[in-house]
Regions:
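Redox- and metal-dependent alpha/beta enzyme cores, enriched for Fe-S-associated oxidoreductases
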Residues: 9-65, 69-79, 92-100, 116-117
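Conserved small/polar residues in nucleotide/adenosyl-binding loops
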Residues: 1-5
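C-terminal functional extensions of proteins
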Residues: 28, 70-71, 79-81, 87-156
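Active-site-adjacent beta-strand anchor residues
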Residues: 52, 86-87
Length: 156
């Protein structure tokens, strides 16, 4: 398995799987730091801090819960904390608050400029006009086939 460095460290701590990490980060999650977590706790007694596993290990350690986007959504839904900070891309809190109006969200706002490039009009354009095609060589396609098929099978 080959994934980014911070996520690799988290997955390795949760499993017995050997992880081969590549030197990469998520620019949103890597901006968070342990001091910020402690400062938020000082200003907001009783707050629950939930972190995405792509955050640096010290941020995950300082948090109350670490999990995937789905795991974070489930945490809020199932625990209904009075106040929560989601250590992830800031629009995630907006989306989850709609379904959890009784939960107060503290939003450290780190935006992902790449995620913001994906819009419904652009997706519609791709579907209607078949734009944005990605062309790969046969060798790359064959190497990617097995993991892509495994991911698709998980969703079935």
């Amino acid at each position: 398995m080959c994934i980014r460095d911070s996520l690799a460290k988290y997955v390795a701590s949760q499993t017995d799987v050997e992880i081969i990490a590549w030197k990469g980060i998520c620019m949103v999650h890597d901006q968070f730091n342990e001091k910020e977590i402690h400062d938020i706790r000082e200003k907001n007694p009783g707050i629950k801090i939930i972190a995405h596993p792509e955050c640096p290990p010290e941020v995950i350690k300082a948090s109350d819960f670490a999990g995937s986007t789905g795991g974070m959504i489930d945490y809020v839904k199932n625990n209904q904390p009075q106040k929560v900070m989601m250590v992830t891309e800031c629009s995630m809190s907006d989306n989850i608050q709609v379904e959890n109006p009784n939960v107060e969200f503290i939003r450290p706002c780190n935006l992902c400029p790449h995620m913001k490039k994906i819009t419904l009009p652009k997706i519609l354009d791709c579907l209607e006009n078949e734009t944005g095609e990605i062309i790969m060589d046969k060798e790359t396609i064959e190497k990617a086939r097995i993991p892509v098929e495994r991911m698709a099978a998980i969703g079935r």
